[in-house]
Every structure is written in C-alpha cells, then in structure tokens.
UniProtKB/Swiss-Prot annotation:
The organism of origin for this protein: Leptospira interrogans serogroup Icterohaemorrhagiae serovar Lai (strain 56601)
Protein name: Peptide chain release factor 2
SUPFAM superfamilies: Release factor
Family per record: Belongs to the prokaryotic/mitochondrial release factor family.
Modified residues (N5-methylglutamine): Q254
Highest classification ranks of the organism: Bacteria, Pseudomonadati, Spirochaetota, Spirochaetia, Leptospirales
GO cellular component entries: cytoplasm
Post-translational modification: Methylated by PrmC. Methylation increases the termination efficiency of RF2.
PROSITE patterns the record matches: RF_PROK_I
Function: Peptide chain release factor 2 directs the termination of translation in response to the peptide chain termination codons UGA and UAA.
Protein localization: Cytoplasm
Any one GO molecular-function label of the UniProt entry: translation release factor activity, codon specific
Length: 367
C-alpha cells in the first residue's frame, strides 16, 4: 500500500505491532516457545541418548516446534521495533522519511500475512510429510490422461516450493495416462498446504483422443493424508489385511525392476488399498506401504471422531472428500476456478505448470 503521510505511517505501524502481539497470544506461541526451550535443554543432555527411543521423540518434537516458530522468530523483532524506528526516522527526516519507511512497512505486512496463514495450520498433522494419491474416475483414457496431467502439475508445484517428493506407486493407463499414482511429499507444512487438494478435480476440454473433436468432461479424485509418527498407536491386525507382491513397472509400461518387489496391501474391513513399488527392496516397499495404510486408518479414525462430535453438537458440515473442489476449463474458454473459495484465473497453462499456490493460500484463508 502507498503510505501518504507521517501520521498515517505512525498509526499503521502501531496497528501492525498490535496485530502481531494479538496473533502471538491467540496461537499460544509463548507456551510453544517455553516448550521449545525445555526440549532444547533435554536434547543437550548427554544422558538422554541412554534411551534412544526417548531421544528420537525429543528430537522430533523439537524439530517440529522449530519449524512452527522459526518463521515467527525471524520477523518478530522487526515488527515489534518498527513503531520506534518510525518515530526516530520521522524525527530526523520528517515527511521525507515516509517513502523509505513505507516500503519497509509493506515488507513486514506481507510477511505477517504469510504468518497468519501458517497460523491457520495449527494441527500437529499440518507439519507432517504427506501422501498424495491421484485416482482417475470413470472415463477410461480421458480421465487417465487427466490424472497424468495432474501428476505433472503437482510435481512442478513441489519443485517450485522446494519440497522433496518421490513417486512411490504408479500404474500405467490403457494407452495413455495413469490408472493411479501415489507421491510421498516432504517439506515444511507439507500436509497443511496440501490437505486442501482433497476432492474431485474436473477437466473440460476438446478431447485429443476423439476424432470428432468433441468436448469431454473428465474427473480425477485427489486424496492427501499425513504421514503418522511411530508413537501414534494404530492397531493393524494380520487377519484384516492381504499382502500381494508383484513386479514393478512405471507409467507408460517402462520396466523398473525384474523382481517381484512391489507390495500392495488391502485392509479388508475398511476397503483401503495402498501400494508401493519405488524401492528395489520388497521389505522397504512393504514398510512404506504400511506407513501409508497407517496414515489412512488414522485419518479414518479422525473422520469418525469428527462426525460423532458433529452429531452430538447438532452440526453437520459438508464432507469435502468426494466433492468437486476445482474446475479446469480448456474449452470454450480458459479458466481454472476453485468452487470453495471462488478464486480463479484464466492462465490455465501456468496452473498446469504448477502455479497452484494462490489456490492453496485462498483455501487456507477460509480455515
């Protein structure tokens, strides 16, 4: 924003300081700061490593708190000192100092708005790595091709975001596209940023597979779940699962491995199926598949608890999973629109090249 006077600058600098302090208090960040101090002291105690499991948990919790608090620490002092800086500069330069302070105010305000969005990610799961699954709906080649387009869109987004990712399972489509894909995504607030992608993504375009060049509508479901810590107890009975092993193969039929190292686990009571084939070792693929199953079962338990709470409180909210969240229209006009936030853009090419951060941020603002 353009600041027009010294009086206005003094007012908005104090408002920014107050907003920061209010948000700090609302999010109980002082308590988190004390917890981080306590965990740091524990981590520095050499006797801690006599118990490797406790040491691992302390280190993990410390790292998670640092991820949450470091962005606030980075900007905290600048915002708290800004009103004093304004007073000193204006005393020295008068109205001539408004310009340089205005740009600094805009920088701090922008950083604070980013922090407010991170403040919406207050659940412990939001800090976790994520599993992202892409599954085409009915429609054969059309929807399978759309699934592969979304796979590319997400991997481009991860690259721009600086997230690490691995394609842990993929099934080639019939002639084009993919029948299924699962990604493991690691980065700050990976699940928190990606959880809003849960739902059905709709594509409208002139089909490249239709000789008559007719317009087709395709649907793909995206499911995101957090990776769950080992200390969270999710019981999986041997009698409830079926484990299948098979030979790995990549999208487009590309041969990946010559041994039956890929693992698929079916949890029969829930109907959940997970698979992993990116490792050469069957044991590693099995471990990853069990992590995915654990994440899905944990999520299922959370959903049941949420539904029970809504039932008791007399509330019933729309279920996001299974609902159409976003449309990507390539014909007769260019438009990508999120139906939850009404955020939209006509630059379809940029979105398909991974420019989905504005959609993700718009969704986080609704939380």
């Amino acid at each position: 924003m353009e600041v027009k006077s010294a009086k206005e600058l003094k007012r908005i600098s104090k408002e920014l300081q107050e907003n920061f302090l209010n948000r700090w208090k609302l999010l109980n960040l002082e308590q988190d700061k004390d917890r981080l101090k306590s965990l740091t002291e524990k981590a520095e105690d050499p006797n801690l490593w006599n118990n490797p499991e406790e040491a691992r948990l302390v280190s993990q919790k410390k790292n998670e708190l640092e991820k949450k608090l470091n962005p606030w620490f980075t900007i905290q002092q600048d915002i708290l000192d800004f009103p004093d800086l304004v007073d000193l500069t204006l005393d020295e330069k008068g109205e001539n100092g408004v310009g340089e302070l205005s740009s600094e105010y805009n920088r701090l305000q922008e950083k604070f708005e980013e922090l407010e969005l991170l403040g919406a990610l207050k659940n412990p799961e939001d800090l976790k790595p994520a599993f992202l699954n892409i599954h085409p709906g009915a429609g054969g080649t059309e929807s399978q091709d759309w699934a592969e387009m979304l796979l590319r869109m997400y991997t481009r987004y991860f690259e721009k975001k600086g997230y690490q990712y691995s394609l842990i399972d993929v099934q080639a489509g019939d002639g084009a596209g993919i029948k299924n894909a699962t990604l493991h995504v690691i980065g700050d607030f990976a699940f928190g940023f990606l959880k809003g992608e849960n739902g059905v993504h709709r594509l409208v375009r002139i089909s490249p597979f239709d000789a008559n060049k007719r317009r087709h509508t395709s649907f793909v479901s995206v499911h995101v779940s957090p990776e769950i810590d080992d200390d969270i107890d999710i019981k999986i009975e041997e009698k409830d699962i079926r484990v299948d092993v098979y030979r790995s193969s990549g999208a487009g039929g590309q041969h990946v491995n010559t041994t039956d190292s890929a693992v698929r686990i079916t949890h029969m009571p829930s109907g959940i199926v997970v698979a992993c084939q990116n490792e050469r070792s069957q044991i590693k693929n099995r471990d990853t598949a069990f992590k995915m199953l654990k994440a899905r079962l944990y999520e299922l338990e959370q959903e049941k608890a949420k539904e029970e709470l809504e039932k008791k409180s007399g509330e019933k909210k729309d279920i996001a999973w299974g609902s159409q969240i976003r449309s990507y229209v390539f014909h007769p006009y260019n438009l990508v629109k999120d139906h939850r936030t009404d955020h939209e853009t006509g630059n379809v090419a940029a979105v398909m090249d991974g420019d989905i951060e504005p959609f993700i941020l718009a969704y986080l603002k609704t939380l």
